[in-house]
């Protein structure tokens, strides 16, 4: 079907692309319909049905997208992209969409996170579509951003409205983020202060980039963002060992080593190779098939496996490594209590998802939390502890058994539930606020067991807010059913400081 709009042809053309701006259909260069309709008798009421005329435009207009980044095809059937190239989406299925280039006419699969809707705000470097207030703060406070870095996001509470988030420096709080409501006008415009109104968000950004005019600071550069990693190719699950190249050893754990490497020479991944005999390959594959379906922004993504021993687990690569190690670095040791609690809230969010899926982690601690370049925390190794066939790990007397993180009922009776994960989360909170200190400092594992049986609980760490310590103590209730849910702890941690400060800055 071609363009069926009756409008000025010269104004309908997008530069270098034969697409009608009104209906998004291609305009046939040889078609007589390109000619300007001047004859009044040919003007037709669009609401009236006429016989012998071309079929009307589909009410579901084509979905046109623009490439945000270059993409080199690496698979059979995917389509290369050039930044700024426009495409028509033919089918949305999972993380790879079938599309047709409006430049070349070629069809193929494209990564959904490399494109954005044409004629929308999504291609703008300062616009972040689905971003919460907390995540906006985390992004803006991440390394690479400076005073005045900003973003505009969709409002969490008011559909169709937006919020402006700006990085600022406060004498009392240090680096902080200020939020401003962008209010909608009846005529379609926007304003932060009613003194100055704008017909578009682009105008608003341009204005406050040249003058703060009541904001905490003039807008600087848009919030830094990284080119996303393309989604894992849909058919690659059990992969040959030869497709992996181990490049840099990141660490060695109780069950094997972790490497940074590449899959098929182009996709950066983390590769965990398990010691032979540490678990049954068949049991691992069954568990891995469950794990790969647990997909959430706060869980490390499981990409693929090598199921012949030595078993390889291929996951997304997290630049900052484990949380316990990161907290001890020169960057980690400088994190404010606000940022530490934000990290705790992120972990609680991931565990709330695991809780909702009736799954159990079994080995929740800072060593099994990974940190991205933007300081986003993700939960790793969920479910693997159950498969370990090493008595040093599975027996409570074993040297590898994580006594200090394990709930009493799991130590004594091997009873692991989501409530034993809650206990472990309380211990993890102490690791976070002490910048990676080992729990129960100065105690051996047998001493920890004896003290727990007598009702001992760790004292409040230095610089730990009283309310946070009270949450820890709830996690360490003797009766598992009395411990809080992760969903509850997520809401408490996300709103920890919000209750005592304004949600938004006053109108300038």
UniProtKB/Swiss-Prot annotation:
The keyword Metal-binding does not apply. It is a lipid-anchor. Disulfide bonds: none annotated. The modification Phosphotyrosine is found at residues 393, 504. One of its GO terms (cellular component) is cytosol. One of its GO terms (molecular function) is ATP binding. Residues 60-120 form the SH3 domain. Residues 244-497 form the Protein kinase domain. Keywords: ATP-binding, Cell membrane, Cytoplasm, Kinase, Lipoprotein, Membrane, Myristate, Nucleotide-binding, Palmitate, Phosphoprotein, Proto-oncogene, SH2 domain, SH3 domain, Transferase, Tyrosine-protein kinase. InterPro entries: Kinase-like_dom_sf, Lck_SH2, Lck_SH3, Non-receptor_tyrosine_kinases, Prot_kinase_dom, Protein_kinase_ATP_BS, Ser-Thr/Tyr_kinase_cat_dom, SH2. Binds to the cytoplasmic domain of cell surface receptors, such as CD4, CD8. Belongs to the protein kinase superfamily. Tyr protein kinase family. SRC subfamily. This is Proto-oncogene tyrosine-protein kinase LCK. It comes from Gallus gallus (Chicken). The gene is LCK.
